[in-house]
């Protein structure tokens, strides 16, 4: 009751504060951005020209010392008879390594644009070859150029660079006896609300910027001076799969998470779009998607920002929601229905490593058959630059990051507002709505040939289900399911996800159960449904959730499990008001889950079973905190005569084995990697991926390894564990997790080895606990007379003190606690990662 009252008080406080402060926040978020007059250089000229809404100053006519260039060995060409824009009529030529230097006014993210033109007919210009690099606290290889590869149209190469020094230099280096050239340069600071995720390293080279469904937008019509090209039909795999739509309505910039501002993209982008075009000859009961295919560098990391604004729907309801796919593997929910008004612009950010095909596909897909929801307004795609000067593409980074953009409200930045935002964050975490951006979802919307644009799949019927031939004796009548769930009463709903919904139920014999019901008629999850039944029907283990039965009557897909009283491991680590688990309890839970996975990996008559979706939400706890691994819908059987399995990538983002992502080869070691991420969750009590954290902290495993290299692991530990962990126990536990997270599978331990190591960690902890108990007893016995100091047992192997128990190190270095769910259900919960 006290908790309920507290929740109501919090809700009332939030409501009042939102009403008071929202006008200021909204004004701050949507205020008009004015591009700063930093540096606009007209190279090779002594005169100023106006272009793209800015005045470009001649590089020989600068009245300040803020811009300088290497004058030795340079040459100038001035062709005023050209019909090209005026900034392209002059060019500065370098025959030796040369540079432009800028004295910046501020650090942080900056736009850098280099303008090139080959309108001059000189032979040495047409054969010029040179490279461009930049330095501002770190070096960046920007681009290698050869004008002979360009058209006669002037080209602008745009970069987003993080400036770490006020001294910024752009270097031009001709190849051998060739030369370098430049027509104009722009350097200016980006707006504060332009957030780039740390997963991209914040140093980017723009390769595509499209006004989808609309005309070309010139720099004069963009507050940031960008050029938006129309998405020609060349990008669409099937030209008739989409139609252009446009609107005269002014975009409603509302501010907030993932919401766009007037500087995110021009109004014109949000007034036009391409929408699904379901032709009259489409068969009834089909899922549909539309795909844009882009030529990119192979095996290279890309940052993609996708723009949306619902100018299509008449009503804000779930019928307008659809899926966004990246390269056919990763799915994220796009929910226009969650926007407060129609025509409210928002965006999704993605970081993706391209495969070896040289193509990167972006798709929108329907959620339900016979629906044509789905649209796209704009797209920006940028290559990631490394700080060391080479392209950023390494095997350990072969993963997709789905990031929620954030518009920063600077005008109302007070302590009260920060408190409000934090409470709103907790409120969001408590709500039933899931965050699909956090956990990537695997689904292949495309046909087997690359670049496909449509997947027309009839809704499956289950009359020929292979389960009927297994004679499992696990079928439960649908009438019993209805009775157990009180006709699927929403009051009994305890979880939902990509497959369907989970209900707490009482079976006719009085047994508690968790009933998972697939989304009726969606045609999704059939294979997962059958796989889970086939896997669970052949295994029984103390640390694996048992399947009680299933039902497939009336095209239903219903699974019935034993009821796990204490819910998921995740709920006991973060995101709820449950009491914190002790370090000993956490170790015992890890050992139990490891034993369950080891049992799966132990070859049976048909082969080992690879779980393929190990995560903290798939480890459940019974009333005695006994851990059991759950959710086998993605599991695969691995025969002993196969070295590995080559399959499409499935799983949950944040837990995916990088080698599996790179090669599509699945082994038991993929489960080991995911379990290593779970070990980090257990120790640091935070999600594998949390887009609400600062960019460098979003990915748990990467952040932990960074902190380990800096010797700051103790600063990010779960505060509730401070004073509990014995030094050697912590050290050994981190060693196990690090081994599990090795880049290559053959470097990782088996689950059997992990069990042994975890049991050793538990022994280390228990020895310390017993020693401390003995010391307390000795002190108590001697308290009747003069106090006798306890005799400490010291050895070379074990420390008598936790590294967090004494002195300043025991202080809680966190500024907040994570308490975000108002109600905890005991069940089998489904995440949206399917």
UniProtKB/Swiss-Prot annotation:
Keyword list, A-Z: ATP-binding, Glycoprotein, Kinase, Membrane, Nucleotide-binding, Serine/threonine-protein kinase, Signal, Transferase, Transmembrane, Transmembrane helix
Family membership: Belongs to the protein kinase superfamily. Ser/Thr protein kinase family.
Location (main, coarse): membrane
Binding residue positions for ATP: 494-502, 516
Positions on the Cytoplasmic side per record topology: 427-834
Pfam families: Malectin_like, PK_Tyr_Ser-Thr
Residue ranges of every copy of the Protein kinase domain listed in the record: 488-761
Transmembrane region(s): 406-426
Enzyme class per UniProt: transferase
Extracellular topological domain: 29-405
Active site per UniProt: 613 (proton acceptor)
Signal peptide: 1-28
Stored CDD domains: STKc_IRAK
Residues with attached carbohydrate: 61, 149, 221, 246, 277, 289, 314, 352, 361, 394
EC number: 2.7.11.-
Molecular function, one GO term: ATP binding
GO CC annotations on file: membrane; vacuole
Protein name stated in the entry: Probable receptor-like protein kinase At2g23200
Membrane topology, from the record: Single-pass type I membrane protein
Compartments (UniProt record): Membrane
């Amino acid at each position: 009751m006290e908790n309920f009252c507290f929740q109501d008080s919090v809700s009332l406080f939030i409501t009042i504060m939102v009403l008071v402060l929202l006008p200021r926040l909204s004004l701050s978020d949507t205020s008009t951005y004015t591009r700063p007059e930093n540096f606009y250089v007209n190279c090779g000229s002594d005169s100023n020209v106006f272009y793209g809404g800015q005045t470009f100053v001649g590089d020989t006519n600068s009245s300040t010392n803020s811009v300088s260039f290497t004058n030795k060995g340079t040459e100038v060409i001035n062709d005023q008879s050209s019909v090209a824009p005026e900034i392209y009529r002059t060019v500065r030529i370098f025959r030796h390594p040369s540079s432009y230097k800028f004295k910046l006014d501020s650090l942080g993210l900056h736009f850098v644009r280099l303008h090139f033109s080959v309108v001059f007919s000189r032979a040495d210009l047409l054969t010029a070859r040179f490279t461009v690099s930049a330095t501002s606290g770190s070096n960046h290889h920007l681009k290698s150029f050869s004008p002979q590869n360009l058209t006669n149209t002037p080209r602008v190469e745009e970069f987003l660079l993080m400036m770490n020094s006020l001294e910024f230099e752009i270097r031009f280096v001709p190849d051998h006896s060739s030369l370098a050239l430049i027509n104009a340069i722009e350097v200016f600071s980006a707006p504060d609300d332009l957030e780039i995720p740390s997963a991209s390293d914040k140093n980017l080279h723009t390769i595509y910027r499209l006004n989808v469904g609309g005309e070309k937008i010139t720099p004069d019509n963009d507050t940031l001076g960008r050029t938006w090209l129309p998405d020609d039909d060349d990008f669409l795999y099937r030209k008739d799969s989409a139609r252009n739509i446009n609107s005269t309505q002014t975009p409603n910039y509302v501010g907030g998470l993932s919401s766009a501002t007037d500087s995110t993209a021009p109004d014109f982008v949000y007034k036009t779009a391409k929408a699904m075009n379901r032709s009259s000859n489409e068969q009834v009961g089909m899922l549909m998607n539309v795909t844009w295919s882009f030529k990119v560098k192979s095996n290279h990391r890309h940052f993609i920002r996708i723009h949306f604004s619902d100018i299509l729907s008449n009503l804000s309801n779930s019928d307008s929601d659809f899926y966004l796919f990246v390269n056919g593997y990763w799915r994220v929910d796009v929910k226009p229905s969650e926007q407060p008004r129609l025509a409210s612009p928002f965006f999704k950010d993605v970081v993706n490593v391209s495969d070896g095909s040289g193509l990167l596909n972006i798709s929108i897909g329907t959620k339900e058959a016979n629906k044509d929801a789905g649209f796209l307004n704009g797209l920006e795609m940028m290559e990631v630059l490394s700080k060391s000067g080479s392209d950023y593409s390494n095997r350990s980074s072969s993963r997709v990051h789905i990031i929620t953009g954030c518009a920063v409200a600077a005008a109302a930045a007070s302590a009260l507002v920060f408190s409000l935002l934090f409470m709103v964050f907790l409120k969001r975490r408590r709500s039933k709505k899931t965050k699909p951006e956090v956990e990537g979802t695997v689904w292949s919307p495309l046909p087997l040939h690359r670049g496909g644009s449509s997947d027309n799949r009839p809704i499956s019927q289950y009359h020929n289900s292979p389960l009927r031939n297994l004679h499992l004796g696990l079928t439960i009548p649908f009438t019993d399911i209805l009775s157990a769930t009180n006709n699927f009463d929403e009051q009994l709903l305890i979880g939902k996800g990509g497959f369907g919904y989970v209900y707490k139920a009482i079976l006719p014999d009085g047994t508690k159960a968790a009933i998972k019901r697939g989304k009726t008629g969606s045609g999704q999850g059939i294979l997962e449904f059958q796989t889970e039944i086939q896997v669970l029907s052949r295994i029984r283990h103390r640390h694996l959730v048992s399947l009680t039965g299933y039902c497939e009557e009336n095209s239903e897909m219903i699974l019935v499990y034993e009821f796990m009283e204490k819910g998921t491991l995740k709920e006991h680590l973060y995101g709820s008001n449950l009491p914190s688990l002790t370090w000993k309890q956490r170790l015992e839970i890890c050992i139990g889950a490891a034993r369950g996975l080891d049992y799966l990996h132990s070859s049976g008559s048909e082969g080992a079973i690879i779980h393929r979706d190990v995560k903290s939400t798939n480890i459940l706890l019974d009333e005695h905190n006994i851990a059991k691994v759950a959710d086998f819908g993605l599991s695969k059987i691995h025969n002993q005569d196969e070295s590995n399995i080559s399959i499409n990538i499935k799983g949950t983002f944040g837990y995916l084995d990088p080698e599996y992502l790179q090669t599509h080869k699945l082994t038991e070691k993929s489960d080991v990697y995911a379990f290593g991420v779970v070990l980090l969750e257990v120790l640091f009590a935070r999600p594998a991926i949390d887009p609400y954290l600062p960019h460098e902290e979003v990915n748990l495993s990467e952040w932990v390894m960074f902190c380990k290299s800096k010797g700051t692991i103790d600063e990010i530990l779960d505060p509730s564990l401070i004073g509990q962990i014995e030094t050697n126990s912590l050290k050994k536990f981190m060693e196990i997790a690090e081994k599990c997270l090795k880049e290559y599978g053959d470097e990782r331990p088996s689950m059997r080895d992990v069990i042994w190591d975890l049991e050793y960690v538990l022994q280390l902890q228990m020895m310390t606990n017993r020693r401390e108990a003995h010391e307390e007893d000795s002190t108590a016995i001697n308290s009747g007379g003069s106090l006798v100091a306890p005799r400490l047992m010291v050895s070379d192997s074990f420390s008598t003190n936790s590294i967090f128990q004494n002195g300043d190190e025991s202080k809680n270095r966190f500024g907040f606690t994570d308490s975000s769910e108002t109600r905890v259900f005991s069940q089998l919960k489904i995440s949206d990662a399917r």
